[in-house]
């Protein structure tokens, strides 16, 4: 029946599409026509846009009438809300054209995307020093391929609209029927397969896709994380909440409580373990800050806590705000160091993964080169770092974090306040003398805090010899929960830092770690290393044969991490 329908409709397709081809004016690009053919899709699920994506390329396009981008790369935008953007620049040296996807909620090159709902890319001039600068945005398929500088070139043939309306219904019937059939077959297969699964089979195979309710699908990966999600970095807007059963309280902080919980399936008693961070009604702002940070899809990284979704819930205790994330059974780093002495290899893995996570947080691009908003944590400490099953770190607790949006004014940054935990505050934060003109100074406060955490790790490493009981940075020099004034006396007046015993330096790898953390807690923020530099240094520690040039000692670190004194 399906084949007969296709055969019957095919001649009509040829006739109608021939009419379309004959009525398209030469100046109307493919992207505009594609949008017209889409019809009115209000009420349908919004799919990611298809845009030209060539970043910055040299162009011969002038700014008089209109032109094509000549970009050969078409990309599906990562997020449904992203639109197509084109940027045309002319300076004394050349003309360049940039085509990308971008979320209109955020500025691009410091400008708001005011025309993000336009079906065509009509250039508007922006004021920029030293160059002629035009930018446009639009929300139809590949609409940034056809760049318009004069709005009279945006008109299209009235006959074209009528023809396209006629052909749309006929064109969509065959693929729609095929799609429904494929979905039905796949659904039946999934239901049949799920019913046949047994616990013994599950325990002997790699963990696969598991469906639950209509909210989202969860992909269970390897032992590096207990859970990850295809709908990660999203807030759950569905009226039906995720089927979660709270288990035990595993942590409590200033703003929220953290529970171990069971995420149940619809059709069985099986469940997966997740963590649920619950904020009371009065801590809405902290929940919103952390939710907004997690909702940035470019934040995803193996050394940043895996986010599942965020929910608003009504309980007998009143309204609550939930963040649902991966659960890591080893707990936070402070707890882990209190209970365990670590080896040199453990220290290298923990330190390296911590630096990589912070470097990604601070970076203005993803590892694959996509633009990303830099973020500063502002409350880095060992209790805000989780230990994964493979003994690597992941950052969590972003309730005090700050997005370094270039559109923020100095006043906006000044109003962000003196935040963090006093024991881990950098000197300039304690003294409230941050350089608000330079956003890099915010990142360097995180680097200072990271140095203290690296010291904590090193103090519990058996490669240095005698290992004392765990103590936080500054140990008994300050009380258990020191105030800002107490830390000012220690850090500013006395220029105090945690002690590095001389025998730690007998191990070549530990010596490099100590040199690194000493440079990271320098009193001068501009003299500190960047998180990326620290990550690179730890990467070098994976190759002991390359370390001789970094130390006075000519001895090498063998695979077991001990100091090799063999000549």
Curated annotation (Swiss-Prot):
Enzyme Commission identifier(s): 2.7.11.30
Residue spans, topological domain Extracellular: 24-166
Bilayer-crossing regions: 167-187
Classification via InterPro entries: Kinase-like_dom_sf (IPR011009), Prot_kinase_dom (IPR000719), Protein_kinase_ATP_BS (IPR017441), Ser-Thr/Tyr_kinase_cat_dom (IPR001245), Ser/Thr_kinase_AS (IPR008271), Snake_toxin-like_sf (IPR045860), TGFB_receptor (IPR000333), Transform_growth_fac-b_typ-2 (IPR017194)
Binding-site residues for ATP, renumbered to this chain: 250-258, 277
PTM note: Phosphorylated on a Ser/Thr residue in the cytoplasmic domain.
Glycosylated residue positions: 70, 94
Positions annotated as active site in the UniProt record: 379
A Gene Ontology BP annotation from the UniProt entry: mammary gland morphogenesis
Keyword Glycoprotein in record: yes
Reactions that this protein is recorded to catalyse: L-threonyl-[receptor-protein] + ATP = O-phospho-L-threonyl-[receptor-protein] + ADP + H(+); L-seryl-[receptor-protein] + ATP = O-phospho-L-seryl-[receptor-protein] + ADP + H(+)
Domain of life: Eukaryota
Residue intervals annotated with topology Cytoplasmic: 188-567
Known cofactor(s): Mg(2+); Mn(2+)
GO cellular component: activin receptor complex; caveola; cell surface; external side of plasma membrane; membrane; membrane raft; plasma membrane; receptor complex
Disulfide topology: 51-84, 54-71, 61-67, 77-101, 121-136, 138-143
UniProt cross-references to PANTHER family, sorted A to Z: TGF-BETA RECEPTOR TYPE-2, TRANSFORMING GROWTH FACTOR-BETA RECEPTOR TYPE I AND II
Protein name per its UniProtKB record: TGF-beta receptor type-2
Organism of derivation: Rattus norvegicus (Rat)
């Amino acid at each position: 029946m399906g084949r007969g329908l296709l055969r019957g409709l095919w001649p009509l397709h040829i006739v109608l599409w021939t009419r379309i081809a004959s009525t398209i004016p030469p100046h109307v690009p493919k992207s505009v026509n594609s949008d017209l053919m889409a019809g009115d899709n209000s009420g349908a699920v919004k799919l990611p846009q298809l845009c030209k994506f060539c970043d910055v390329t040299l162009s011969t396009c002038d700014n008089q009438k209109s032109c094509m981008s000549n970009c050969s790369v078409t990309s599906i935008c990562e997020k449904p809300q992203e639109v197509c953007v084109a940027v045309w620049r002319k300076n004394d040296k050349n003309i360049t054209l940039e085509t990308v996807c971008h979320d209109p909620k955020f500025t691009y090159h410091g400008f708001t995307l005011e025309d993000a709902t336009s079906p065509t890319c009509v250039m508007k001039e922006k004021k920029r020093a030293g160059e002629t600068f035009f930018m446009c945005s639009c929300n139809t398929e590949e609409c940034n391929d056809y760049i318009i500088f004069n709005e009279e070139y945006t008109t299209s043939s009235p006959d074209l609209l009528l023809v396209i309306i006629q052909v749309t219904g006929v064109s969509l019937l065959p693929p729609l029927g095929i799609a429904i059939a494929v979905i039905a077959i796949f659904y039946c297969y999934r239901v049949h397969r799920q019913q046949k699964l047994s616990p013994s089979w599950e325990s002997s195979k790699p963990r696969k896709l598991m469906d639950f309710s209509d909210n989202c699908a969860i992909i269970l990966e390897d032992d590096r994380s207990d859970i990850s999600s295809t709908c990660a970095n999203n807030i759950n807007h569905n009226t039906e909440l995720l089927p979660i059963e709270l288990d035990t309280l595993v942590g409590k902080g200033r703003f929220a409580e953290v529970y171990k919980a069971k995420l149940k399936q619809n059709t069985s008693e099986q469940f997966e373990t997740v963590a649920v961070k619950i904020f009371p009604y009065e801590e809405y702002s902290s929940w919103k800050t952390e939710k907004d940070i997690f909702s940035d899809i470019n934040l995803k990284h193996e050394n940043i806590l895996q986010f599942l979704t965020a929910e608003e819930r009504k309980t007998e205790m009143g309204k609550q705000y939930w963040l649902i994330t991966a659960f890591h059974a080893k707990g936070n780093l402070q707890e882990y160091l209190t209970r365990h002495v670590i080896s040199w290899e453990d220290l290298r893995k923990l330190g390296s993964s911590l630096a990589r996570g912070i470097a990604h947080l601070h970076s203005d691009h993803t590892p694959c080169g996509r633009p990303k908003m830099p973020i500063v944590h502002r409350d880095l400490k060992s209790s805000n770092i989780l230990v994964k099953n493979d003994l690597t770190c992941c950052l969590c607790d972003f309730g005090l974090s700050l997005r370094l949006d270039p559109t923020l004014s100095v006043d906006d940054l000044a109003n962000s306040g003196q935040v963090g935990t006093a024991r881990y505050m950098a000197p300039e934060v304690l003294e409230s003398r941050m350089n608000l003109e330079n956003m890099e100074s915010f990142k360097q406060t995180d680097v200072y805090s990271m140095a203290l955490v690296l010291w904590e790790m090193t103090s519990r490493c058996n490669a240095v010899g005698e290992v004392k009981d765990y103590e936080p940075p500054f140990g008994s020099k300050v009380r258990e929960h020191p105030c800002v004034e107490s830390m000012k006396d220690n850090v500013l007046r006395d220029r105090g830092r945690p002690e590095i015993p001389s025998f730690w330096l007998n191990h070549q790898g530990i010596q490099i770690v100590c040199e690194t953390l000493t440079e990271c807690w320098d009193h001068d923020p501009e003299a500190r290393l960047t998180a990326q530099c620290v990550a690179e240094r730890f990467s070098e520690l994976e190759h002991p044969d390359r370390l001789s040039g970094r130390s006075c000692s000519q001895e090498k670190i063998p695979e077991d991490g001990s100091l090799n004194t063999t000549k």
